[in-house]
């Protein structure tokens, strides 16, 4: 929050508490700073908050304990939760020897109320206050673990004097290690009056996500809804952009600065927040109502997801990472897109795709890795699941300016398993995609088993394939027979083996045999029983070189069967 607004901008929080269990949100936390003033502490005012799809009520200053109780009663009646602002949670309380007793009396007043969500402690502290904040926050967690102790941090554009540290990263590190908060909340207002955006907006998202993941702490973002100081009045697209970029970065709670418009602000800044000074819906109210509604719907899924990576395409913002070629979804390199990847507890994979441009809609063609067999959108409007059309491993999506779409990925990959030991040589490749344990490919690529044939593509000068895990008795076979078709290459093949006595392939354990690289099927017999290092040996692995010295790159060798006799 801005320092000039702090005196009146009392905060809020989000999530739902489990009685005397560590705080965990039951619903995606959506809240605001600066709620109805004391004289508007009415059921009608809180109904307007509820109708805007907020889940947690923020508060404005000047509430007495009785006012807070009245507010909580209204919230409970409407199915809302509320943050408590009370001087007994102030960071200065840590200076008193009896601060634990202060908190005890606070919890006695509010802790058992069904609408209590948490307790506001401080906004935008300097690092020198972290030790005191740690005492207050941890005492609240000890005495009332089911409710959230809330502290909000500065943005990246704060000065070292404001931060109390030379860098923002150290500020986060000290806060998380000393205070041990339940959430990592911050504000960053990127929309400037000159029409530009702060260049460090995404870097701030990166740092918050990174440190939140390091410490296992959920992150919250505070978004701009009030034109003030050097910040412009957001458009609907810019409001959407703030929401979906935050969601893609794994934010587990969103708040708006502000909900209420004070008369002095309206006069000084010439605009309104979400409601006007009389508590009546202003221009942004229906916009926020829709975005909050979408967040509530998507939040049912997002709360259970873990952010695994966030990447960009187009011109990559400062401090961010370009999407790499190994990602499951590939983006057009020239479009300003953002993609966040997630997994749930079962390993199911999700992605949030966002248009980083809040001025223009975009259409994008996504290229999927071969093992991604389906994309299903979780619709923000109603939570319904909508399969997306795929064609040749690609999907086309349209995105509103600043908009995002949440996708669930369906994947199917046949992971190779350790071959089972074999006591016989009889390979016929009759099961599609089953290599029957053959591997160790060298200078051979693209193995395909189809229609009773193993097909391989030449890609180098020393092609061979290996079948290990054999348990052949001594002298079990006297010859190896192979039926194959060779398009090109030298007219000579080789057959190697290993034994229990000599477990490595070597030039003293192989036989050459003549080949016909004419593109026709031929059967070949390799008289292994005549070799002294085959005779009487327990064979453990075999290797087939379908030609020596390689073949024309891209040409094929097809193998019908390999068997021992």
For every predicted segment, state its role.
Residues 3-15:
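Bacterial N-terminal signal peptides
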Residues 19-373, 380-411:
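Glycan-processing catalytic domains of CAZymes
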Residues 339-343, 385-390, 442-450, 456-457, ...:
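Short, exposed beta-strand/loop patches in secreted or surface proteins that constitute
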Residues 348-350, 361-363, 394, 404-406, ...:
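Intrinsic-disorder/low-complexity, polar/charged segments enriched in Ser/Thr/Lys/Arg/Asp/Glu/Gln
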Residues 407-414, 560-565:
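Short beta-strand-to-coil "C-cap" segments at the C-terminal boundary of structured domains/repeats
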Residues 414-442:
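Extracellular carbohydrate-recognition regions
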Residues 454-534, 538, 546-558, 564:
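Extracellular ligand-binding interfaces
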């Amino acid at each position: 929050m801005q320092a000039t607004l702090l005196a009146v901008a009392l905060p809020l929080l989000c999530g739902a508490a489990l009685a005397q269990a560590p705080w965990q949100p039951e619903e995606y936390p959506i809240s605001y700073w600066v709620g109805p003033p004391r004289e508007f502490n009415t059921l009608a005012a809180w109904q307007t908050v509820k109708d805007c799809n907020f889940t947690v009520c923020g508060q404005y200053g000047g509430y007495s304990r009785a006012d807070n109780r009245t507010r909580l009663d209204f919230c409970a009646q409407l199915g809302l939760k509320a943050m408590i602002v009370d001087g007994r949670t102030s960071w200065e309380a840590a200076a008193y020897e009896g601060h634990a007793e202060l908190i005890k009396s606070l919890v006695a007043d509010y802790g058992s109320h069904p609408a209590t969500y948490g307790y506001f402690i401080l906004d935008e502290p300097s690092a020198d206050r972290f030790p005191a904040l740690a005492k207050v926050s941890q005492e609240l967690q000890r005495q009332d673990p089911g409710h959230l102790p809330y502290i909000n941090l500065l943005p990246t554009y704060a000065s070292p004097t404001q931060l109390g540290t030379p860098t923002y990263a150290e500020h986060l590190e000290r806060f998380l290690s000393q205070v041990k908060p339940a959430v990592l909340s911050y504000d960053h207002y990127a929309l400037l009056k000159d029409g530009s955006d702060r260049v460090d907006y995404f870097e701030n998202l990166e740092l918050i996500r990174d440190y939140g993941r390091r410490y296992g702490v959920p992150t919250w973002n505070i978004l701009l809804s009030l034109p003030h100081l050097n910040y412009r009045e957001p458009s609907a697209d810019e409001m959407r952009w703030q929401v979906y970029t935050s969601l893609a970065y794994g934010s587990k709670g969103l708040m708006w600065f502000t909900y209420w418009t004070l008369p002095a602000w309206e006069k000084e800044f010439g605009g309104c927040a979400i409601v006007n000074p009389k508590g009546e819906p202003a221009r942004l109210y229906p916009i926020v109502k829709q975005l909050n509604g979408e967040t509530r719907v998507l939040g049912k899924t997002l709360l259970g997801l873990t952010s695994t990576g966030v990447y960009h395409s187009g011109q990559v913002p400062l401090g961010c990472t370009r999407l790499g070629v190994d990602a499951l979804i590939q983006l057009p390199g020239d479009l300003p897109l953002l993609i966040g990847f997630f997994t749930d507890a079962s390993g199911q994979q999700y992605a949030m795709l966002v248009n980083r441009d809040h001025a223009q809609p975009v259409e994008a063609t996504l290229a999927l890795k071969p093992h991604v067999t389906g994309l299903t959108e979780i619709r923000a409007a109603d939570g319904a699941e909508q399969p997306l059309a795929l064609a040749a491993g690609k999907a086309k999506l349209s995105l509103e300016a600043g908009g995002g779409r949440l996708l669930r990925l369906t994947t199917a990959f046949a992971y190779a398993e350790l071959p089972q030991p074999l006591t016989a040589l009889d390979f016929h490749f009759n099961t599609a995609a089953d290599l029957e344990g053959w591997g160790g490919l060298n200078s051979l690529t693209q193995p395909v088993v189809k229609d009773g044939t193993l097909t391989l593509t030449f890609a180098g000068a020393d092609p061979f394939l290996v079948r290990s895990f054999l348990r052949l008795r001594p002298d079990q076979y006297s010859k190896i027979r192979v039926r194959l078709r060779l398009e090109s290459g030298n007219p000579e093949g080789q057959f190697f083996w290993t034994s229990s006595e000599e477990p490595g392939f070597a030039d003293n354990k192989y036989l050459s045999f003549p080949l016909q690289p004419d593109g026709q099927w031929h059967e070949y017999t390799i008289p292994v029983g005549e070799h002294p290092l085959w005779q009487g040996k327990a064979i453990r692995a075999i290797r087939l070189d379908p030609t020596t010295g390689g073949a024309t790159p891209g040409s094929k060798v097809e193998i019908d069967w390999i068997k021992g006799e």
